[in-house]
Amino acid sequence: MEARPISTDPITYLDKDGNQQVCTAYTVLTSETKESILNYDDKWYDLPAGWYVVEGGVTITPRLDTHGEVNLILTNGSHLTAEWGIDVKVGDTFTVYAQSTDEGTMGRLTACLPADFNLDRMVHYSVWPDSGMAGIGSSARWRAGNDGIRESEGTIVINGGNIRAKGQDNASAIGGTRAEDIEFRSTDRGEVYNRRQGGSITINGGVVRTEAFAMSVGNCTTVESVGIGTCQMGYGGSVTINGGTVIAEATCDAITTGYGGTITINGGDVTAIGGVNNFAEDLNRVIPGNGIGPYESGSVTINGGTVKASAKGNGFGIGGARIYNTGAMTVTINGGTIEAAANRNNAAIGDKGKGESGVTINDGVIHAVGKGSAAGIGSKGDIRITGGELTVSAEGSGAAIGGFADSYSERVNCKSITINGDVIQSISSKDGACIGGAAGGSVGSITISDAELPLLSAKKILIGWDADSPGGKLTIRNCRVASTDTLSVLTDGIRVGSNSELVIEESEIRLPHLRGIRVGGNGSIAVRDSDLHTYGIFMDETVHTITDAKTLKKLEITDSTVLTGDIIGARGEYSSVEEVVIRGSSIRLNEEYTYNYCTIGGGTKGSFGSIDIQNSQIHIPSPGLNTAIGNGHQAYFNRESRIRIANSQVFVGGAKFGPAIGAAYGSSRGQINILIENSTVTAKGGNLRSDTDYIPGIGKNSSGRASEIGKIQILNSTVESFRLEEKDGTNYVYDDLHTKELPGIPAE
């Protein structure tokens, strides 16, 4: 190509900081057009290193090919149309400047490749490709002597101008071609791969738009086209947005990077929509694509700006590893105003990476919505939230914060969730937890501390998970947790699955009617220095054989106040609680609940190992079919159990057909020993099955099936034990405990 004339008339432009600068040596671009790119022998328009200026309307049909550092100034009112785009390959830097920050005044650059080229596939790719070319960026280059080259990417800097770009299939609008290798060849030493490297894209100002690839015919789900960043399968690369207005729409990922690449947003007004279906043949097809985030591994960091990101199809609003999870993927938010949505699966903000992956939120005003099986904020790794103002919801089976289902409808469990401080302004979910697992999922650990959570709302679990999890732990410390949900069936409020630990410390928990605090089999519960209003605190597991029996290892309540409507312990066929420890606490039955049942120990079909109550106040006037303190109705166990009440005040009513303290009616086998010392105890036996029945306040039913009472010891205590005189009566009289003549119980 002949040398172009150089102009020396001073021309101004705005630099990356918006300051006016002057250029005094540049080339003014002029139009070069033909009806078709195929009419050119040389289909490339070389731009050697230097400065170029666009004045008025300029159209160039061949693909512009940068060499070295190429700077382009768009004067006010100008418009450069690069019909076949601008090639920026490795080693090249392409920088765009404008003269104004006003969108209506600043110069324009359009690099939208034709969508209707070679639809009949009559042009061989070696003549001119119909895929693999970016609007601005690297290409699949099929030139003589360079056949098979898929270029690594160069450096693109946009400081101003009104930029509009669209690439081909298998390419970016702004970025590069889609390929893992630049080239592949076989030699006598084996196969040789040359990995394709991503480039650097920086947007400091201007208005930048990318259009989603579209076809009038064909299967849209086979299209691999992205907006801004390294196209799929490249390595590394970066996108940095410091200012300006960015509107990125793409068939797949709207703003993206290669394996292990980075996306950083420090400012500007950014809108990113991935998974856009602009295909006339089938507008209902679901396309995979993230709003902001890579195909696989990498990082997204948002430090400021206004960001709106969504995945219309399968993908993350902000995040990545939507298909494979071959490496680490992280999302970090340190500031900004952010709206994110995932419309089908994955998460509005999240990841599915391997290794040191996760989501960290330190600040920012964030609205995140997960629809379908998506989470609001989700991760396969660690979620850590220590600052900001969050409004989060999940409208399907995903958790508001936690687990989700991926693009293949496979459940993704979160490794850990940490929330510190009053960061959540509003949170709700449908079938997943507000904080925890997706429906049927689990979490490795959850820690919520120093937080006054907003009113929680969900159809199922509020906090936690319901699936088995080896060694899972949920800790709530120095928090206030409340919900005003109106429920018609028993629903877990705070829940962990089997083999897990639940710890509540220095907290206030207010759960509505029918919401309880529950752990799965072989787990444990500890409540310390807390105030709880709950349906119950318990394990509820039913199995069909004793060999599969589930156990609550330990239930500890220390220095706490508990208002409950049901069990504190374990229930379910063949279930048991090994140890109940109550220290310095007040436990009362919530008499507002219609069922008014409460048991400390074994609930229905549940047994216990030991119950140790010290320095506490217990008020349970109506335990239903179970004892207030002891085992449950129809409990089966074959061991010796122990009840100890020391330095406490206890008022308990009797179970139906059973005592208040001891063995419930219908229980079988085993033996219970009872020790009361330094305490004041009032116990009333339950209703009689017949007028000949004898049901004491402490002990067992004299007729019918019940576990044995081994020994009752009363030391330095005031104990009043009553029984009803007749069936359905109201007149209580002292039973024979004080004479040591209770039926079926040996004297000391």
Where are these regions (language model features)?
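Accessible peptide chain termini
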Residues: 1-2, 748
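N-terminal domain-start segments of secreted/luminal proteins
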Residues: 3-71, 474, 478-479, 488-489, ...
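Surface-exposed loop/turn motifs in large extracellular/passenger domains
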Residues: 46-49, 63-72, 87-170, 174-312, ...
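Catalytic-site microenvironment of enzymes
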Residues: 78
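Substrate-binding N-lobe of the ribokinase-like
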Residues: 399, 433
